[in-house]
Amino acid sequence: MKIKAVAIFLSLLMIISLFSGCVENEKPIKEGSNDFKLIPVNSKSNFEEFKNTVENSIGNYIYVGHSYASREVQITSTVKSSNVETSTEPERFSKTNVQVKGVDEADILKTNGNIIAFSQNKIYLIKPLPPKYAKIIKNISECGYLYLTNNTLIVISWNKITSYNVSNPEMPKIIWQMDLNGSYVDSRLYNGTLYLVVRKNSIDCPIVWNNYKIGYDKYYIPELPPIYSMDFDTTYIISRINIKSGKVENSIAIVGNYKTTLYMSKNNLYFAYNLKINEKKLMLNFLNESADKYFPTEVADKIKRVIENEDFGDNAKFVEITETIERYLSSLPSEKRHNLMKKLQNDFENYLEEHWEEFEYTGIAKINLDSFEVKSGKVSGHLLNNFAMDEYNGYLRVATTIGDWRFRDKMTNNIYILDSDLNVVGKLTGLEKGERIYAVRFMGDKAYIVTYKETDPLLVIDLKNPKNPKVLGELKIPGYSTYLHPIGNNLFIGIGKDDDGKLKISLFNISDLNNPKEVDKYKLNVWWSPAFRDYHAFLWDEKYKIFFLPAYNHAYVFKVEDNKIEMVKDDEHKTNVLRALFINNYLYTFSLSEMHILDENNWQLVKKIEFENYLPYGYGFK
């Protein structure tokens, strides 16, 4: 009977195990307020108290990060000058595909029209004009993410940032260099200023980062609702750096966890991270509120006494209550046990539905670009990526999904609108239950969201009234898009997969917001494109109405005309294609091993340049 009871009890544990991890030694945690906010720690004693709370919560899984010294950079010449060249200035050139026009983002390919910088196993400086005589003129023996503004090339490698003067690209000169003293997370470049986020896998204060002291007044810690986990093991350093001098002009630190998202407008930097519910506490709260419904008085009273005992942490309470329930179940006849289990499961699912918006949060820090003043707020759910946040007319719009693979049928999608103080003033919740967001794009006072389960709903959402967002239209088609790109004339392109898993390009017409349409589509017999996860791989050329899409060793070029998608060029390389750019009327496509130059008027190959000793498995930091 005991064995059989334990076996039946395992089904109850299946419910509970959805909301629990490994049992760790845990002391009682001092709870925060009933809301999320970031506050400066302000004193050593406050910091030590916070650090002890975190260490007790996550089982001391904190380690001290390392600082890496810079290595010497070698700059080598590769090609001598040729007398057949003629000097020419570009009429137009492409910029990196970014989220916010005018706010640059780091990538592996950059141009200012006169030179191209391509980061692979090394940084290649290429003279692109005239196209027939294009050549590699310098190699820099490092690699990383790049910015190229006027004649300044910034390289963010795995352990440092280096700024080069490339006014004479045959003789680039180092202007300044600094150690990252942590791991690179993300960055933006705006108005001659670099905004940088670095992660340190430790919690420590005060911090001196590149001679800038971050004291207790600039070290921000979270205050959380009691039911949320204190799983913080990381410090994020957010800095403003003058790109001319390399001077750190301002810097703050925020304690967070590993999953973060960065979005920057021209006024504010938004730094968001996922806040997970303490899943044991959720179950304990359910039992504390409902134990009288399922158990006799002595069992229910014991459960409540254990929960209310402040001498034990949640893990210890969870173990004791589990054993108490197991003993009670062992005493019941089989049918009664089964009925009780079924009722517990049904009631807990209803409880979860009632508290669904509390299941997970995204904490958001808003950092003013000028003053570095910090404000904070929260929304329910988690973000897909940086396109899930957008600032417009003083409001922050956020798209989230609540739930994960364990709750596929319960997942919901939401839009939240926050004011300048990050208070929620409007929301639209419960969208497309059982699906999750695959793509989102905010454009003006509208949002376009793609969710997916079996079909691809494209939702058009009106955000004109921030306090009352509403769905205007919906389109359901097979497959899904992971990236949406507006191309004007009420059209945008969706890059994703069809229902058979093959790459699909959709052309959407949103001239009738109440009735969006997929006016054309194009399928490729491939499974993957870098643009699925990295929108920097996508390029739109407005002059020729063409877009570039890489897939494996192919650089595909498509033209959009008369609501139709037409492939105009399949530029095949020897290795995986990564990026493209245009200068004047020429398209430059880049793979791991070579660069091709195509004439956009006839799509003929004008020039091919090979890269030596390329990385066979892709680019990366040394």
From Swiss-Prot:
Q: Which PROSITE patterns match?
A: PROKAR_LIPOPROTEIN
Please provide the record's keywords in A-Z order: Signal
State the signal peptide span.
Answer: 1-20
Pfam families the UniProt entry points to: Beta_propel
Sorted alphabetically, which InterPro entries does this protein's record hold? Beta_propeller_containing (IPR019198), Quino_amine_DH_bsu (IPR011044), UCP006425_b-propeller (IPR014441)
Keyword Transmembrane helix in the entry? The reply is no
Identification of the protein by name = Uncharacterized protein MJ1554
